[in-house]
Amino acid sequence: MLGVLRRYHAHDVLGLENIPKSGPALLAVHHSLATYDAFLFGHAVIRETGRTFTGLGDDKLFAVPGVRRFASASGILPASPENGRKLLNEGHLLGVAPGGMREALRPSSERKHVLWDKRKGFVRLAIQTGAPIIPVACPSADFLYTVYENRLTKLAYKKLKLPVPVARGFGLTLVPRPVRLTTYVGEAIVIPDGAIDDPETVDTVHAQVTAAIEALLDRRDTRDS
């Protein structure tokens, strides 16, 4: 399936040289509604670098049998500080989407917005393990679907933490639009030696990563030039 989607969207990754050839790194990924752009990126990393790449996913994913099997087969583990710390301490590449479901459910009026304001656990994890943070974003993924702002989506997320989007893709269907997808990998944000997990340090690094993601989201696919 991912091979089909890769060809359908002419998916490409720019900036793979920013991923270290060895040692731990935390890849902070912007979250789209479609989500599979992140899977395409993960498989590209494995294919092009030969490195093990593991992502952390929302616990809700693992409550649905079919989705659980797909997530597990794609190297996704339930999100927890323990899982993240173990992988980084073992020297692996770790992928996280700090915005989570909340960011994925953004209406199209908030395309390319970064909703990480209160999501700082990934920064603490990087500080605790010394792993660099690498920003990753696929701007055009926000154009695969038109997502409508509505009370049902907000209520389902607020009360039950369930994704109930109202969206459409190609025409009036849920088939994703044949948009070219380019994932951009930014330069690593290195945690300073001796950095401690205190609010000031966390806020400083968090602001750096957020600004880097926003810059990547402003990039335009040069193949459309």
Across the structure, where does each feature detected by a protein language model lie?
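A generic secondary-structure signal marking the coil-to-beta-strand transition
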Residues: H9, G23-A25, D37, R51, ...
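Short secondary-structure boundary/capping segments
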Residues: G3, E17, R68, R85-K86, ...
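Non-catalytic C-terminal accessory region of glycerolipid acyltransferases
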Residues: K86-S225
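Helix-to-loop junction immediately C-terminal to a conserved catalytic motif
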Residues: M1-H31
